[in-house]
């Protein structure tokens, strides 16, 4: 049977932990590399509901985007939300792998998926962050172009459909859209960089 280590190694090949940003906490955060994993649940966050779903389907592993454990843990108790989740995972032999900024940055990761969903060709990064194991440049965010210039209202419609959302925050400057920048996650620090690139 497949082991947690096999799944971790597969995910690490797609989005190496070495790509993560310094503040982040990714990889196997709860569990045992040598435990078997017959079923896996994917989630954005490890919530109480996600843990209950994993238990109900008999999943031995949850793979989430956002880390369950972010800062230093001084204690693991049932009085604390994160502590309760960790206790529940351990009691039910459920491991947790988190792939956060490494998945955002990786080739084919979150930022590339966003560009693809919007129909844009990737031309570069908002900010270089280093090189991968093969020596290829990697970075935060993506910059690219649509196949043709379109009106702002049409671009908003594409965004709503691609992201499956009913609402967007925007400022209509009355301009057409051709070049764009995306940044998975908060991205507030990259707003100025995006203005340089587009």
Indicate where each model-derived feature is located.
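Hydrophobic structural segments
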Residues: 1-196
């Amino acid at each position: 049977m497949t082991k947690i280590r096999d799944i971790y190694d597969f995910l690490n090949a797609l989005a190496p932990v070495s790509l993560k940003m310094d503040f982040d906490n990714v990889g196997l955060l709860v569990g045992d590399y040598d435990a078997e994993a017959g079923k896996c649940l994917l989630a954005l966050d490890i919530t109480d509901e996600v843990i209950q779903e994993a238990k109900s389907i008999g999943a031995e592993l949850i793979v989430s985007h956002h880390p369950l454990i972010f800062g230093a843990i001084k204690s693991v108790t049932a009085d604390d939300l994160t502590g309760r989740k960790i206790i529940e995972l351990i009691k039910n032999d459920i491991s947790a792998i988190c792939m956060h900024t490494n998945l955002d940055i990786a080739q084919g990761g979150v930022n590339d998926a966003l560009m693809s969903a919007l129909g844009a060709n990737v031309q570069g990064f908002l900010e270089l962050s280093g090189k991968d194991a093969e020596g290829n440049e990697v970075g935060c965010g993506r910059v690219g172009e649509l196949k043709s210039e379109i009106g702002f209202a049409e671009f908003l419609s594409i965004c709503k459909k691609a992201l499956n959302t009913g609402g967007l925050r925007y400022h209509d400057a009355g301009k057409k859209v051709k070049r764009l920048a995306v940044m998975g996650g908060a991205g507030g620090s990259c707003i100025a960089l995006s203005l340089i690139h587009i």
